[in-house]
């Protein structure tokens, strides 16, 4: 008796055990923004992505720790008092600053990632956050972020700073800055508690410029004479700091400044994340 050929299904079974089901990739950001349910493998319940927001804040200079929220826990407590429900349990990444703002620095566009437990309209999130922020802190902008994207803290690659300087004329500072940029290396040390960290400052400097500042008539003797702008890299092994650049301006290979270079103020203009335009 003639046997019929095997069916396609039987051919697959005869090759061996069936392959594990393929988990579909996360949906694009638009799906999260509109609140559509994330696809799930067969046998698993569909999951609604947690709403994730990226806040941009203007922070004043703080000279005493604790004057304003700093760590993730302090920000989480402040936001919860606004009536916003944060996702998950305390201490599990519900709120994450991109990078800590050093004491004495002004932050013009500091980044804070927030994961909420419920999806809310953008206007409502904005108004609740603004109502919860202490008076010196300003919400500059916010937008939703695809939940699968890297956290801001893991994506910081550089930062832009603006430094007001006094005590030395801008042309003299500019010559010193040019010597730093021409150097192949700038060995430096940082001292913290009982530890000393040796690093090379030169590869951390992306760009550096000096502009003259014309003080108004009748300005104080310590009025700014120059404005330093610098972009510094953030690396896993070392982070560029503007105060390191200022101290290097007065040391070899830079020429003598002929006076005491004083810092009047430092502003972190913005943090650059992976993929940001220059």
Say what each PLM segment does.
Residues 2-26, 47-50, 64-65, 182-278:
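Core RNA-modification/binding signature centered on pseudouridine synthases
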Residues 85-117, 147:
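Short, charge-patterned binding micro-sites
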Residues 59-86:
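N-terminal ordered "arm"
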Residues 117-122, 168-170, 235:
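Helix N-cap motif at beta-to-alpha junctions
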Residues 52-60, 161-166:
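Active-site-flanking beta-strand signature of metal-NTP-handling nucleotidyl enzymes
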Residues 122-133, 173-183, 244-246:
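Short amphipathic alpha-helices in soluble, non-transmembrane regions
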Residues 108-162:
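Ordered, amphipathic secondary-structure segments that act as subunit-interaction surfaces
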Residues 149-167, 269-278:
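Short, low-order "capping/linker" segments at domain edges
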